[in-house]
Amino acid sequence: MRIVVALGGNALLKRGERMTIEAQRTNVRIAAVALADLARDHQIIIAHGNGPQVGLLALQSASYAPELPTPLDVLGAETEGMIGYLIEQELMNAMPPGTRIATLLSRVEVDVNDPAFTSPTKPIGPVYTAEEAKIVRAEHLWSMVSESTGGLRRVVPSPAPLAILGLDAIRLLVDAQITVICAGGGGIPVVRGETGKMEGVEAVIDKDRTSALLAQMLAADALLMLTDVAGVFRDFGTPDQALIAHITPPELDQMVFEAGSMGPKIAAACAFVRAGGALAGIGRLSDARAIFEGRAGTRVLADAKNKQHKKQAKTMSKPTSMSIGVAVTD
């Protein structure tokens, strides 16, 4: 099957972990094992988050006083190259000899009038204590938001993806059975200027929403959003919290989720399934195969497809012509 897999930034860099290349390489190596296992039986397309990484680069850039800070679109491109390289190398090491993998920079068009530009919600960078956040906010005039796990993070605009530029090149590689890593960090945000030419813009697109669009455009059978939590919970953070094993978009419409974390994943899952996708899964990176097969995580399915897809996933034991896209959370 064809699966788009979205890897969260927090799956590549654990919460509270120092943002060193070695730490990220170690985490990517672990991720590569899970992805290689999934790729044994399916075709995967990999997207990834960049929240911690792009935030760190922005902080480093802002600290270099002689020059103006590097804009977020350029920093996003930097993270696509950096993280894509790490994933490609470790995945190549984890997969059979002869496996073909390609990492592509992806520009994604957004609307210059998207309301997200006046209401930032996307957390990026490190988690600050209240005192640290006070200093950073005063120095850089950044918007900050409290994390559910404690501390504060910078938030930036996260406009909706309208179109993935260069999609034909991605499709060409996918159809040639090449494992593609693309749409990193949600893609490089660009807008159409007054002259009709594309221009970069200060934003970080949510990678889950871009991954859902990518999965739709590639006619993927499944979208997996892999992060550092077990899935979607009812009554999260209370003594009564319980993992939701499977649910439909209409049921999710009745629930409320945090705008900067689980909310985008829910929106992406619902959008993909409503567009005809068979399955959208949310859960831990280490449970990638189990989520797809219905043994872990949360699975979002259309009513009529629930039983049918569960049966298909359980009986699937050898490679098929379908592809899978993986999105990594941030």
Q: Predicted regions span which residues?
A:
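C-terminal catalytic "cap/lid" subdomain
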Residues: 1-330
